[in-house]
């Protein structure tokens, strides 16, 4: 599809525009919501234990980001991408504009204050929980349940529980995300450890049921467990057309 000059300029020449706030939201296992996984962790755009994904979608922080981007203003959440670009690297902003630029037409629906009513998540990076079977030194209790006992022994009682969920409870986030599955283009699985999470296999089952085999699957996994009960991840991967795995070995 041919793009208008202004659309092409946004995707390739703008120093601040990014497709992410129109297609995506990222959630920590503790419920904090961010535009993406590289966003400044000091500036969450909401909390999914207090509000739904849909409510955060058009709450003031996310609306302000969209408005700033369309006005070619910088966003405090995006400093990591700006820094990478200043050093000559390809940033997540750059790659997102390339990978999701096919959606640039929806940006025209954005209201003057940054409100965007076309609530369809095309890219998931929701850390359903912190469930993990390892306690890697580069991690901690927020992203690995296996760290909790060690942290408690070292520092005393923790301010957060051993097991955490992105939503208000184990089922909440899954229930909110199901309606977006038909629109998915990409899913990033991390955790916790995604290959031992029930939600991971539920999502793959649903993608398979809807025959969405062109959805790009990207993994950050310790690769120590390849199955959950009777479900083996290799049986799923062979059915999808684009699977990328980052494995800790």
Give the residues covered by each predicted segment:
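Short Cys/His-rich "knuckle" micro-motifs
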Residues: 88-92, 140, 147-149
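Generic structural signal for small/hydrophobic residues in well-ordered secondary structure
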Residues: 28-31, 53, 81, 128, ...
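Core AdoMet radical
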Residues: 121-131, 142-169, 181-200, 210-229, ...
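A short acidic/small-residue loop/turn micro-motif
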Residues: 16, 40-43, 144
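Local cysteine-cluster metal-coordination motifs and their immediate loop/turn environment
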Residues: 20, 35-38, 74-86, 131-141
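A C-terminal junction/extension of Radical SAM enzymes
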Residues: 1-33, 102-112, 117
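Recognition helices and adjacent regulatory flanks at domain boundaries
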Residues: 88-122, 132-134
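C-terminal accessory region of radical SAM enzymes
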Residues: 1-8, 38-85
